Regions:
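Conserved small/polar residues in nucleotide/adenosyl-binding loops
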Residues: 205-211
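Intrinsically disordered, low-complexity regulatory segments
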Residues: 1-164, 168
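Short, amphipathic alpha-helical segments that act as regulatory/interfacial helices
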Residues: 114, 118, 196, 200-203
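Histidine-centered active-site/metal-ligand motif
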Residues: 44, 192, 206
Length: 214
């Protein structure tokens, strides 16, 4: 019997989907039934590696090493997520699985979460996209009746990779630069720093009032 592997973004969503499509038999890390295997990520299972993964010397924050500009991105697996990632890789390679459904959240970040796992596993099996904005049973059924080709969302994945890379480049380099220059850890980020500038556009106003003796 062949199966379609469905990968959600989190366990609660996977359970909701499984209940609708009939995957009602619980296994270790996934559910099976009615021609489906339903499993899940736990947020990001792969994260951009820290600078020292590119060169050992980057473990120490030095002005001379800036800017740090990786030619190719490297990814790391958080220790607490290795088991689930290994399971997803095994399911993708399972000979009974003939296609995969990306059922992560309908958005840029959800696309990134799934695609990184799909690529890490070296999966070449056909991939479709479940794109829904509601977790109501009717919406899930409608979504599975109208799955989209995975390639329709290639540009969304590219945008997510660019966003993550921009955050890394600005966050790593700017944080190290200002921290080294001022001798104290100063966190700088692509979103955080402009937001702070909007909230506090100039230095606080200092008022000097003369004292009057009565």
């Amino acid at each position: 019997m062949s199966y379609q592997l469905v990968i959600a973004e989190k366990p609660s969503v996977a359970r909701s989907i499984a209940g609708v499509i009939g995957a009602d038999k619980k296994q270790d890390g996934y559910m099976v039934g009615n021609g489906y295997l339903v499993s899940w990520c736990v947020g990001h299972l792969l994260e951009l590696a820290q600078p020292e993964a590119y060169k050992e010397q980057y473990a120490k924050w030095r002005y001379e090493d800036l800017p740090i500009l990786p030619e190719n991105w490297k990814y790391e697996v958080p220790k607490d997520k290795k088991t689930q990632l290994a399971l997803l890789c095994r399911l993708m390679k399972d000979k009974r699985v003939d296609s995969v459904v990306c059922a992560t959240d309908a958005g840029r970040e959800g696309e990134l979460i799934f695609r990184l796992v799909y690529e890490y596993a070296g999966c070449k099996k056909p991939m479709e996209r479940l794109w829904i904005s509601s977790m109501e049973d009717a919406a899930i059924r409608e979504g599975f009746d109208h799955l989209h080709p995975g390639s329709d969302y290639d540009k969304l994945y590219d945008a997510a990779v660019c966003r993550a890379g921009a955050d890394w480049l600005i966050g790593i380099n700017a944080t190290r630069l200002f921290s080294v220059l001022y001798g104290v850890t100063l966190n700088v980020g692509r979103v955080m720093s402009p937001t702070l500038a909007l909230l506090v556009p100039v230095s606080y106003t200092h008022l000097t009032l003369p004292t009057i003796r009565l």
